[in-house]
Curated annotation (Swiss-Prot):
It comes from Cereibacter sphaeroides (strain KD131 / KCTC 12085). It comes from the Bacteria. Its EC number is 3.5.1.18. This is Succinyl-diaminopimelate desuccinylase. Pathway: Amino-acid biosynthesis; L-lysine biosynthesis via DAP pathway; LL-2,6-diaminopimelate from (S)-tetrahydrodipicolinate (succinylase route): step 3/3. Catalyzes the hydrolysis of N-succinyl-L,L-diaminopimelic acid (SDAP), forming succinate and LL-2,6-diaminopimelate (DAP), an intermediate involved in the bacterial biosynthesis of lysine and meso-diaminopimelic acid, an essential component of bacterial cell walls. One of its GO terms (biological process) is L-arginine biosynthetic process. The lineage of its organism: Bacteria, Pseudomonadati, Pseudomonadota, Alphaproteobacteria, Rhodobacterales. Disulfide bonds: none annotated. Zn(2+) 1 binds at residues 69, 102, 164. Zn(2+) 2 binds at residues 102, 136, 353. Homodimer. Gene3D superfamilies: 3.30.70.360, Zn peptidases (3.40.630.10). HAMAP family: DapE (MF_01690).
Length: 380
């Protein structure tokens, strides 16, 4: 009997899988896949739950992979929700709950499509699912752990589809063929504390750091590249921790986040930030230290066989030709891209991470149909 992706989405939403808790979501998926003949392995690392499942022969020449996650962000104030965030309630044409959009519906749709596919038309090849419980957190022991385990065990994917929400307004209008890189820069300015009436006796870290931040935020990183929009820099914090209005503090901190395209790398941007900080230090005498965290480099799966496969299936099922895009935030595709070509396609993501997160019920079955067509066309 075909799996109902709507019912499965509701069941997954009822699993309270807030990172790093598994909440029963991976257990549910494992039971379904095992019952359909998939070889399932739990690849848990440092207490983080992950699931690897394969139908077909290990090392098959053609192995279609899927990547997704069942962990969700916290609900925030549960009293602010119209409905139980872990109720999986269907009302007014919507399925409500945390993770309904991001991305339990996408996981449910592919699980349903994969089970139907291997049972109805067993392919000459293999189908692999990599499902993590650590995408919304640090992501150090999620998809990365799965890929590390696969490499050690001789498991592979020829191509991979990530089921994250990709469509801004309508199902079918956008797929992701790459993502911008992301880095966060933490600045600490150390000056000399003093009385605000005698600024010449102090070294003001606030003024120095403000000068640096102004230069960074007014600098055009680039004008965009062939497949990417212009890189962006956003100031996200500026703190002194100083409650006194007549004291120049000794310390000031600021944070900026950069989303960068393929004109840059994390290393090149770090060098630029260090150079700018050194210039301001030389001008003001205030030491400015930098600590940079690079969450992921930019990447691109050039338009070609995989993106065309996805685009044809989407257009056949929705009538829309998806725009190949690299916009938005990061995803676990940034890890998969080192393993095999990867494209992302999923539902409309307007309510993800919000209070009253919900997915339009009428999108879930068509998403399953798209995924099923992708599988059939890939193995045709």
């Amino acid at each position: 009997m075909p799996i109902d992706p709507v019912a499965l989405t509701a069941d997954l939403v009822r699993c309270p899988s807030v990172t790093p808790e598994e909440g029963g979501a991976l257990d549910l998926i494992e039971r379904i896949l095992s019952g359909a003949g998939f070889d399932c392995t739990r690849v848990d690392r440092n207490g983080v739950p992950n699931l690897f499942a394969r139908w077909g022969r290990k090392g098959a020449n053609r192995t279609f992979g899927f990547n997704g996650h069942t962990d969700v962000v916290p609900v925030g104030d549960a009293a602010a929700w119209t409905r139980d965030p872990f109720g999986g309630e269907i009302a007014d044409g919507w399925l409500w709950g945390r993770g309904a959009t991001d991305m339990k519906s996408g996981v449910a749709a592919f699980v349903a499509a994969a089970v139907d596919f291997v049972q109805e038309t067993p392919p000459d090849g293999a189908v692999v699912l990599t499902i993590t419980g650590d995408e919304e957190g640090d992501a150090a022991d999620g998809t990365v752990a799965l890929l590390d385990w696969m490499a050690a065990e001789g498991e592979a994917m020829s191509v991979c589809l990530v089921g994250e929400p990709t469509c801004p307004e309508r199902l079918g209008e956008m797929m992701k063929i790459g993502r911008r890189g992301s880095m966060t820069a933490f600045f600490t300015a150390r000056g000399v504390q003093g009385h605000s009436a005698y600024p010449h006796r102090a070294k003001n870290p606030v003024a120095a750091l403000a000068r640096l931040i102004d230069r960074l935020s007014s600098h055009d990183l680039d004008r965009g590249t062939e497949h990417f929009d212009a890189s962006t820099l956003a100031v996200t914090t500026f703190d002194t921790g100083n409650p006194a209005t007549n004291v120049i503090p000794a310390l000031c901190r600021a944070t900026v986040n950069i989303r960068f395209n393929d004109a840059h790398s994390g290393a090149s941007l770090t060098r630029w930030l260090e150079e700018e900080a050194a210039r301001v230090t030389a001008e003001t005498g205030v030491e400015i230290a930098l600590s940079a965290k690079i969450s992921g480099e930019s990447f691109l799966t050039p338009p070609g066989e995989l993106s065309e496969l996805v685009a044809r299936a989407v257009e056949a099922e929705t009538g829309l030709r998806p725009e190949p895009s690299t916009s938005g935030g990061t995803s676990d595709a940034r890890f998969v891209r080192a393993h095999c070509p990867v494209v992302e396609f999923g539902l409309v993501g307007k309510t993800m991470h919000q209070v009253d997160e919900r997915v339009e019920v009428g999108q879930i079955e068509p998403l399953k149909a798209i995924y099923l067509r992708i599988l059939k066309d890939y193995f045709a």
